[in-house]
């Protein structure tokens, strides 16, 4: 399995709604509101990089209120 951490920047006033919608996506293990330069952080697990890419492009980034994402893929040990 491939694990990734995703930082989300949301439009002002939409962070709570965005997090609620993100939690409903299959493959999202956790999603929390955070402090700092971003509004939320997700932990995602997918079978492979292709599935991760599809999840990010067709589901996550299409949620109303999502302005920007940064994805960090975990390096297996």
What are the residue ranges of the model-derived segments?
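A compositional/biophysical signature of low hydrophobicity enriched in polar/charged and small residues
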Residues: 1-77
């Amino acid at each position: 399995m491939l694990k990734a951490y995703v930082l989300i920047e949301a439009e002002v006033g939409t962070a709570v709604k965005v997090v609620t919608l993100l939690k409903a996506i299959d493959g999202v293990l956790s999603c929390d509101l955070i402090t700092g330069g971003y509004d939320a952080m997700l932990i995602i697990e997918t079978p492979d990089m292709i599935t991760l890419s599809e999840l990010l492009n067709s589901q996550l980034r299409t949620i109303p209120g999502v302005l920007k994402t940064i994805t960090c893929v975990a390096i297996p040990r």
